[in-house]
A protein has these predicted regions:
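Short linear motifs at protein or domain termini
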Residues: 1-48, 52
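Residue-level recognition of short, well-ordered coil/turn positions
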Residues: 4, 81, 150-151
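Short, solvent-exposed helix-helix connector turns and helix-capping sites enriched
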Residues: 18, 100, 150-151
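Amphipathic alpha-helix face/heptad-repeat signature
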Residues: 38, 42-45, 106, 131, ...
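Mid-protein regulatory/catalytic core that forms ligand/cofactor-binding pockets
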Residues: 51-141
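C-terminal all-alpha effector/ligand-binding and dimerization domain
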Residues: 113-193
């Protein structure tokens, strides 16, 4: 059960707000705009680059690592609130095999930033959605393709997974009213001038 508690030393833990009260809190989009923008930029960069990076990593991933990733995904899929980590296990496996250079440094940061999404209000639900089932199936399919030695299929599927996440999250941020505030954090077009 979700809520807010206050711990007072030597007195105990007191419930300050239950789940119903938490749902009534409205957070202004500009207060979280930087976090939303960083998350969207992370997803965008992953969607743009993951196909080549996963193709490179695929050649170095051992069968037992694939089995472990599948096992981790299946374990978390059946635990409340952990099912959202499914794409993280796929990304973790890839990051482990990006070498020691700048690519690894960038992808390690992207992996860390992927967790931002879990802290954005109303972006994640406690119940599994059709999109969650789709992501689960796609991640497992990608890993099974890699396990079968089909590295190109693995990298193509992985690219589709992260493009799907980017498109889904972008649309959800627009529906929640976060997108415009996030895009106003800085002028992204200046990067290409």
């Amino acid at each position: 059960e979700w809520g807010v508690v206050k711990a007072v030393r030597s007195k105990g833990i007191f419930v300050m707000m239950d789940i119903q009260a938490l749902k009534k809190i409205e957070i202004s989009p500009h207060l979280i705009a930087c976090h939303v923008r960083r998350y969207l930029d992370t997803l965008d960069l992953l969607a743009l680059t993951i196909e080549g990076v996963s193709a490179y990593a695929a050649a170095h991933i051992a069968q037992n690592e694939i089995e472990e990733a599948i096992s981790d995904i299946n374990r978390c899929w059946n635990e409340d609130h952990l099912y959202m980590l499914t794409p993280s296990f796929l990304l973790n496996l890839i990051v482990k095999h990006t070498g020691d250079g700048s690519l690894n440094a960038v992808y390690t940061l992207l992996r860390q930033n992927l967790g931002i999404g879990r802290s954005i209000p109303a972006l994640c639900k406690t119940e599994k959605t059709a999109e969650d089932y789709e992501l689960y199936e796609q991640c497992i399919t990608a890993l099974n393709q890699l396990y079968a030695g089909r590295q190109e299929d693995f990298s193509n599927r992985t690219a589709k997974v992260f493009r799907y996440i980017y498109d889904y999250v972008t649309e959800k941020c627009k529906n929640l009213g976060y997108y415009d505030s996030a895009m106003a954090v800085y002028d992204g077009s200046a990067l290409w001038k």
